[in-house]
Amino acid sequence: MNPENWLLLRRVVRFGDTDAAGVMHFHQLFRWCHESWEESLESYGLNPADIFPGSRKSEVTPEVALPIIHCQADFRRPIHTGDALAMELRPERLNPNSFQVHFEFRCEEQIAAHALIRHLAINAQTRHRCALPEGIDRWLEASGVGKIGSI
């Protein structure tokens, strides 16, 4: 399986994604990051019900939660309604219980924005750190960046 199938996604900016000035509002970029991460996991073959609580198809609540502990974004140029964006995800394992995903948004071959979202694995009951879920581990390894680094 080719990582490009789940790490390079495309999307068109809709009117509802923009503000009164006609450009993407900053919070929409973070929503797109999270949605593209979810889409990436699904394209890789993971069932969202196994990762995210509250899914209709979930028979049990996942034992591990993955809260966002850090996020940042930089806009390099305005993103307008109708812009076709290519979104590249670059996941990076930080240690056995955390990872981050770098996002690059391109419009007409120019970088329009960068973002980063960092997740920490915690036991959903105790709220203490724990190992990443097996599916996330597999996704990180298959994405070709599964080496443990420093935070």
UniProtKB/Swiss-Prot annotation:
A single BP term in Gene Ontology: phylloquinone biosynthetic process
Looking up CDD domains in the UniProt record yields: 4HBT
Instruction: Tell me a Gene Ontology molecular-function term this record carries.
Output: 1,4-dihydroxy-2-naphthoyl-CoA thioesterase activity
Q: Which is a Pfam family this sequence falls into?
A: 4HBT_2
Keywords assigned by UniProt? Hydrolase
Q: Which domain of life is it from?
A: Bacteria
Q: What residues sit in the active site?
A: D19
EC class (word): hydrolase
Q: In which pathway does it act?
A: Cofactor biosynthesis; phylloquinone biosynthesis; Quinol/quinone metabolism; 1,4-dihydroxy-2-naphthoate biosynthesis; 1,4-dihydroxy-2-naphthoate from chorismate: step 7/7
Q: Which reaction does it catalyse?
A: 1,4-dihydroxy-2-naphthoyl-CoA + H2O = 1,4-dihydroxy-2-naphthoate + CoA + H(+)
**Matching InterPro entries:** DHNA_CoA_hydrolase, HotDog_dom_sf
UniProt EC number = 3.1.2.28
Into which family does the record put it? Answer: Belongs to the 4-hydroxybenzoyl-CoA thioesterase family. DHNA-CoA hydrolase subfamily.
Which HAMAP family does the record match to this protein?
A: DHNA_CoA_hydrolase (MF_02101)
What function does the entry list? Catalyzes the hydrolysis of 1,4-dihydroxy-2-naphthoyl-CoA (DHNA-CoA) to 1,4-dihydroxy-2-naphthoate (DHNA), a reaction involved in phylloquinone (vitamin K1) biosynthesis.
| Protein name in UniProt | 1,4-dihydroxy-2-naphthoyl-CoA hydrolase
